[in-house]
A protein has these predicted regions:
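Bacterial N-terminal signal peptides
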Residues: 9-18
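Catalytic cores of secreted/periplasmic lytic hydrolases that degrade extracellular macromolecules
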Residues: 2, 20-179
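Bacterial N-terminal signal peptides that target proteins for export
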Residues: 1-9
């Protein structure tokens, strides 16, 4: 057999195996969640200037792809706690401490909209809006720096989700599509 043909066959096999391994690493619940909420994340990006990739990654991580108790029982996809100014519905849930107060919503859309409002009105997040809207790494690191989550690896976890599921492509859709 010709050496070039053999080399081509080997390269093809390696490529097919690596693509198959990538597909197997993808969590089907994550894929379903992304498909369900990507348009809402893009809509929020257009309105509030928060990268859709960040919104989706946070929703995936904070809600366990919509399967967490907090997401299922109170439609809270972002782990947002009550805070002193919250006047809406609440639910008690164990987190860093037992029976902490979390915001509760009628539906996931309300959770997505409140997440955007929470970030845009929160003074501690103001610096994020100076970043390029497609700078998901800067946003992920900034959210951690601003104290959004207590997990020391929060930024890296968001970045990994964004890159593993190509969520950055939704940022481009939000930037380049017409309103």
């Amino acid at each position: 057999m010709d050496k070039r043909l053999l080399r081509l066959i080997v390269v093809t096999i390696v490529l097919v195996c690596s693509v198959g391994a990538q597909a197997q690493r993808r969590n089907s619940r994550y894929v379903t969640y992304i498909d369900k909420y990507k348009d809402l994340a893009i809509e929020q990006m257009k309105e509030h200037k928060i990268p859709a990739s960040i919104t989706l990654a946070q929703g995936l991580l904070e809600s366990g792809a919509g399967m967490s108790e907090l997401a299922r029982k109170s439609n809270n996809h972002f782990g947002i706690k009550c805070g002193g100014s919250w006047k809406g519905r609440t639910v008690r849930h164990d987190d860093d401490a037992r029976q902490e107060c979390f915001r509760a919503y009628k539906n996931p859309r309300d959770s997505y909209e409140d997440h955007s409002t929470f970030l845009t009105r929160g003074a501690r997040y103001a610096f994020l809006f100076k970043l390029d809207i497609t700078d998901y790494k800067g946003w992920a690191r900034g959210l951690k720096k601003a104290g959004y989550a207590t997990d020391p690896s929060y930024a890296n976890r968001l970045i990994t989700i964004i890159e593993d599921y190509d969520l950055y492509k939704y940022d481009a859709q939000g930037v380049y599509s017409k309103r």
